[in-house]
Amino acid sequence: MVDNEKFEGVVVWFGPKEGYGFISWSKNGVQQKDMFFHYSDIVCEGFKTLFKEQKVSFGIGVNKHGKPKAIEIVVLKH
């Protein structure tokens, strides 16, 4: 993880067949570029999937190409 900071966002899109998706989020009230995530970074039991407009919490890590990605993604309960 880049740092221990956690962020909240909303799933914009997730393709279970493709194995990745994007989260809409903001930092300090400023909208950021949608954050990429890989299904392996979803924290849950059973089948790892997310749905459009689900609220999530996540950290930020770096992928193998040195680009930021969401990690430790957890669905927020209502």
Question: Which residues fall in each region the model found?
Answer:
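Beta-strand/loop nucleic-acid-binding surfaces
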Residues: Q31-G46
